[in-house]
């Protein structure tokens, strides 16, 4: 029901925000040796990019299949574009921080179930600018209790 969903982030624009197209291509690899499972994910959606207090935010809605939807916010400082935060709010919620060769802990919340994880980032390349969009690449490993559960490579293309 529409009343149960968070408000759409695509309304009344100011000079510090604009509508953008968000294209996501991801390669997700789980398992090892003969038990490797590989998924290629492609998502294209509308979003809003904001510039406020030296931070760029890109907000977009993602459909998670049977779990429902999530509002995702990618953000970074203009001065440190290669330290990126992804906040997901919805049926599955979490906050992840990506900085090359760094590890950050987080908690994934899925209704009544929560679990801790670690993001070990291998690579961050960010050419996204508020005035022209760009490309963000995130290459990272997700671990639970020190065990790798998924390798992820994301490419976000942001265009006005």
Regions found by a protein language model. Give the residues of each.
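Acidic, glycine-rich flexible loop segments
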Residues: 90-135
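Short, hydrophobic/aromatic-rich segments at coil-to-beta transitions
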Residues: 17-21, 52-59, 83-85, 103, ...
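Mixed-charge, glycine-accented linear interaction segment located at domain edges/termini
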Residues: 129-160
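A short, structured loop/turn motif at beta-sheet edges
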Residues: 15, 49-53, 77-80, 109-112, ...
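N-terminal amphipathic/basic-hydrophobic helices that include classical n-h-c signal peptides
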Residues: 1-13
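Hydrophobic/aromatic beta-strand elements that line small-molecule binding cavities or substrate pockets
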Residues: 46-49, 73-76, 106, 123-125, ...
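Long, hydrophobic N-terminal alpha-helical segment
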Residues: 10-60
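Short, well-structured hydrophobic secondary-structure segments
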Residues: 40-94
């Amino acid at each position: 029901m529409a009343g149960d969903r968070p408000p759409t982030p695509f309304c009344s624009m100011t000079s510090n925000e604009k509508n953008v197209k968000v294209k996501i291509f991801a390669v997700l690899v789980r398992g090892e040796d003969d038990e490797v499972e590989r998924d290629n994910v492609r998502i294209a959606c509308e979003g809003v990019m904001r510039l406020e207090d030296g931070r760029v935010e890109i907000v977009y809605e993602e459909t998670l299949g049977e779990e429902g939807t999530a509002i995702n916010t990618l953000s970074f400082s203009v001065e440190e574009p290669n330290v990126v935060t992804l906040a997901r709010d919805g049926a599955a919620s979490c906050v992840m921080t990506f900085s090359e060769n760094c590890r950050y802990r987080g908690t994934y919340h899925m209704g009544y179930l929560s679990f801790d994880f670690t993001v070990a980032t291998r690579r961050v390349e960010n050419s996204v600018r508020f005035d022209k969009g760009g490309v963000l690449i995130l290459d990272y490993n997700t671990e639970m209790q020190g065990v790798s559960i998924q390798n992820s490579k994301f490419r976000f293309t942001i265009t006005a």
